[in-house]
């Protein structure tokens, strides 16, 4: 029988059940336990899923069965558990964003590299079959010269979403739409279109009074590939519609809606194109109408990849170093909105954007 890979989860909030279910449904993954600074919350989740509630992170890391630590803490609290886990020789998977600054992200990458452990990130939209088809077409040059890479996320979150947990209404915790929801789709543009050269953004709050966060963003990106990008993000647009990702080149256009390939047209039609047009699964909820309206299947692919990477000795498919450029774009968007002018990349950290 193949040896299982034990997982420990740090953080017992809204996202923890996604990790628990994903690990349980994986081949070779096993949930050892969960830790949260709220012992009551950890105990509730542990009881529901029949796993151990650790009293501290140190206790979790002292359990030799835990080989991988999944960090599911609030956005601004990823650094410490990642570094501690790495120093204890554990592989790490962190929720997005890796951190709220480039400096902390680099510190975490360095800690994992020094410890010789794998360090992956849940930007799980990358693993969707429609996205992988787009990626393959970009890399093979099938689009020709890239002209546009656009993301439209028109979602809805009620006021209660932001008031349900203290950190969700705090700007410094990365609870605005750009980080909390939009990060995934900015990541897809970076993943598909490549390095960004400059950004320009406007951020406002149009639907959640009394919350000091942006819930609506319109931005323009310029990529080294020559492509232009338009990004529209909102959690104020009831009832919420599926995300739309569009890639346009001189020789073709691909559009993903939700996780389904909506448009796949190229000047050089190929036999496999009809099958690609059928990619996706409309049955998985994609989060448009509420935080709970999301499936965990994409999380499971990332979990399964870590299990397989450990077994085979290879790197994970989404190492955090590949997500750092996305964080840089996101931070540049905040800087642009604050300065009310375009920002050229690369950038340096500016903590005042969270004031």
Question: What spans do the regions from the language model cover?
Answer:
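N-terminal Rossmann-like dinucleotide-binding module
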Residues: 1-49
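Beta-loop-alpha module in the N-terminal Rossmann-like domain of NAD(P)-dependent dehydrogenases
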Residues: 19, 49-111
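Hydrophobic residues in well-ordered beta-strands that form the structural core
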Residues: 55, 71, 93-94, 119-121, ...
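Basic phosphate/pyrophosphate-binding loop/patch that engages nucleotide-derived ligands
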Residues: 110-118, 132-147, 248-249, 253
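C-terminal capping/lid region of NAD(P)-dependent oxidoreductase domains
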Residues: 117, 144-148, 335-355
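Predominantly a Rossmann-like dinucleotide-binding segment in NAD(P)-dependent oxidoreductases
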Residues: 125-211, 340
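C-terminal glycine/acidic-rich active-site capping loop/insertion
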Residues: 246, 250-321, 343, 348-355
């Amino acid at each position: 029988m193949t040896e299982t890979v034990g997982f420990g989860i740090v953080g017992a909030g809204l996202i923890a059940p996604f990790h628990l279910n994903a690990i349980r449904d994986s081949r070779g993954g096993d949930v050892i336990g969960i830790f949260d600074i709220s012992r009551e919350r950890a105990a509730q989740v542990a009881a529901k899923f029949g796993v151990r509630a650790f009293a501290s992170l140190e206790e979790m890391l002292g359990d030799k069965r835990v080989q991988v630590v999944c960090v599911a803490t609030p956005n601004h609290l990823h650094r410490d558990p990642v570094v501690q886990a790495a120093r204890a020789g554990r592989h790490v998977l962190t929720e997005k964003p890796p951190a709220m600054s480039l400096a902390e992200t680099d510190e975490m990458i360095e800690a994992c590299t020094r410890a010789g452990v794998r360090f992956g990130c849940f930007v799980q939209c990358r693993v969707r079959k429609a996205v992988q088809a787009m990626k393959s077409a970009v890399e093979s040059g099938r689009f020709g010269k890239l002209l546009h890479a656009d993301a439209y996320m028109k979602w809805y979150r009620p006021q209660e979403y932001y008031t349900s947990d203290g950190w969700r209404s705090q700007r410094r915790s990365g609870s605005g739409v750009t980080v909390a929801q939009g990060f995934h789709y900015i990541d897809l543009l970076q993943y598909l279109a490549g390095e960004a050269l400059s950004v320009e953004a406007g951020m406002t709050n149009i639907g959640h009074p009394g919350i000091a966060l942006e819930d609506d963003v319109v931005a323009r990106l310029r990529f080294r590939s020559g492509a232009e990008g338009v990004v529209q993000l909102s959690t104020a647009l009831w009832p919420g519609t599926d995300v739309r990702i569009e890639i346009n080149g001189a020789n073709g256009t691909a559009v993903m809606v939700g996780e389904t390939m909506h448009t796949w047209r190229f000047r050089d039609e190929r036999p496999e194109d009809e099958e690609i047009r059928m990619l996706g699964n409309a049955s998985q909820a994609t989060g448009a109408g509420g935080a709970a309206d999301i499936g965990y299947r994409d999380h499971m692919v990332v979990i399964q990849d870590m299990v397989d990477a450990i077994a085979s000795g290879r790197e994970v498919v989404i190492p955090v170093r590949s997500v750092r450029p996305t964080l840089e774009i996101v931070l540049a968007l905040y800087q642009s909105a604050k300065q009310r002018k375009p920002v050229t990349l690369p950038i340096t950290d500016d903590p005042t954007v969270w004031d």
